UniProtKB/Swiss-Prot annotation:
Keyword annotations of the record: Cytoplasm
GO cellular component: cytoplasm
Organism: Homo sapiens (Human)
Record protein name field: DNA damage-inducible transcript 4-like protein
Gene name per UniProt: DDIT4L
The protein's role, per its UniProt record: Inhibits cell growth by regulating the TOR signaling pathway upstream of the TSC1-TSC2 complex and downstream of AKT1.
UniProt keyword Cytoplasm, yes or no: yes
Amino acid sequence: MVATGSLSSKNPASISELLDCGYHPESLLSDFDYWDYVVPEPNLNEVIFEESTCQNLVKMLENCLSKSKQTKLGCSKVLVPEKLTQRIAQDVLRLSSTEPCGLRGCVMHVNLEIENVCKKLDRIVCDSSVVPTFELTLVFKQENCSWTSFRDFFFSRGRFSSGFRRTLILSSGFRLVKKKLYSLIGTTVIEGS
């Protein structure tokens, strides 16, 4: 039985239409009871596991940014919008949920887009004991603030220049591209804002 919006349960003509088609009240009731057994209850252990996995992924992304700030970005601070890494981690988990090995089969390439140029920051292998089944390319975006470059101009001259290094501000936008390694079809692009 397929439920549609064209039949109204309060309309006597609809009920007689169902009876004329061979549906009897007992079979309708058993059809509804069927869904009670098919739709599973949410498993609390899975929810807790997913939360801890999400938090671990958030820490991996934050560590990547922390390592890259002095080595590859040449700055003393990276300011990340609130919940940005959390949103990215949730999208990564969602994209990995349909994969054969899940998140364990993921290799993530982390980049930063500065003035339309992508700079490679890191490569994260989620589980080195599993052959990768898909790649994710994460592109953080720099916030376009004119005041930061104006401030850097003033502090780059004079006595503050030796000790002061710029602060990089990330935008709340990002791009996440999924590429399946076992299939020619199936590139997925997510633009976060």
